[in-house]
Amino acid sequence: RYADKIRATGKIDPDLYEKYNVKRGLRNADGTGVLVGLTAIGSVHGYMISESEKVSVPGQLFYRGINVNDLVKGFQTERRPGFEETAYLLLFGELPGVRELQLWNGLLDTCRRLPDGFKESAIIRSPGKDIMNSIARAVLMAYLHDPAPDRLDVETTLRQSISLIAQFPVIAAYAYQAKAHYHMGQSLMMRYPETGKSTAENFLMLMREDGLYSPLEAELLDLCLVLHAEHGGGNNSAFTTHVV
């Protein structure tokens, strides 16, 4: 009965959105995106305006002004994973040299392990059926383990960002393992991440009961991580965060 009342009194005439020029879904009436900010980190070219009409074109993705096609060609030609150097590029605005990449990979290695007791309190004791929900809760729990969670200076924000980059795959894998055990009746298998492995390799190792994966699987996952690495330059989620 109450639900019917809500349906009857909470409906908004769709024509009002056009009348008041409301940007539904952060889209203009012609389907183009609403400009809500400026960024030099990532950009996407997916259409052009011809005679006031939006015309689709072959999509292009740029990170810090570098075409992702060129970025991928570089690390795949040298047969190395690319997500780590892509993260470096997005954060610092330039590609790392050989020595800098080694240091960066080493830093991510040292940050992958979760704090003592974290997986028990944040994941195992409250296993969820929805992995995204589990990840969101784990990030909130990370507040309790951060030595300076409320500081907003660049150094603190960078430290937190690096920790999240390193630990997100571990949290996601552990959340899946907890779901598989408590909700799907499977054995619980939680390994520690290994140093010397890429982000993609560690994720696959943590997800598999036997810890095994093929080079092709690692390469494909690494490529997926590269293509999804920049998701904060002006998308709906980031806009909502800025507004709130």
PLM segments and residue spans:
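Hydrophobic alpha-helical bundle cores within soluble ligand-binding/oligomerization subdomains
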Residues: 1-244
